[in-house]
């Protein structure tokens, strides 16, 4: 099974050995949508069998955001509350909505009552703190997650409920 391989190195679309722009765009769309759905990158064990950490209902509450921060963070959570002007949000949705079936108007600055709320100041984001964002499922699975509040790095984490959502993501 070679998904997207047909045009990846297509010499009629690009130089030999160079990934085509078409393939790069499709790969970016697919990756962002996988993260939106599952909350993490694709994971495999040493035998290349898929590993599926629990899917949690996560909302980011971001201070000092901007358009770039919204673009980087939005796929990594189910909802994001961010202090940026509405026209910036609308521009992001207009640009990104054609790339996903997820309704972005239901993901940005909506009051929902998320299971887990993660609050932080975007001005304090670093490569280290971004690595936590990419691993919330693993972090929560590796600890005895309970209702309550705690801090980790730059993040204030409020756990309202502990529920797993991965079974709702598979349609048979």
Region annotations inferred by a language model:
Residues 1-3:
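A short, conserved alpha-helix in the catalytic core of glycosyltransferases
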Residues 5-68, 75-90, 95-111, 146-172:
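C-terminal, non-catalytic tails of nucleotide-sugar-dependent glycosyltransferases
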Residues 68-71, 90, 124-129:
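Short, surface-exposed beta-strand/loop "edge" segments at domain boundaries and coil↔beta transitions
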Residues 105-141, 151, 155:
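Short, well-ordered secondary-structure micro-motifs within conserved domains or adaptor modules
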């Amino acid at each position: 099974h070679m998904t997207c391989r047909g045009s990846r190195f297509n010499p009629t679309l690009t130089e030999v050995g160079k990934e085509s722009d078409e393939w790069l765009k499709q790969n970016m769309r697919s990756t962002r949508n996988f993260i939106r759905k599952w909350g993490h990158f694709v994971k495999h064990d040493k035998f290349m069998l898929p590993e599926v950490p629990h899917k949690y209902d996560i909302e980011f509450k971001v201070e000092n955001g901007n358009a770039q921060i919204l673009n980087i963070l939005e796929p990594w959570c189910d909802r994001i509350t961010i202090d940026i002007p509405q026209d910036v949000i609308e521009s992001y949705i207009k640009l990104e909505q054609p790339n996903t079936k997820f309704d972005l108007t239901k993901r940005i600055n909506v009051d929902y009552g998320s299971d887990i709320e993660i609050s932080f100041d975007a001005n304090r984001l670093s490569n280290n703190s971004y690595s936590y964002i990419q691993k919330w499922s693993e972090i929560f699975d590796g600890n005895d997650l309970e209702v309550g509040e705690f801090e980790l790095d730059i993040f204030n984490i409020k756990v309202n409920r502990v529920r797993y959502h991965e079974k709702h993501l598979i349609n048979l």
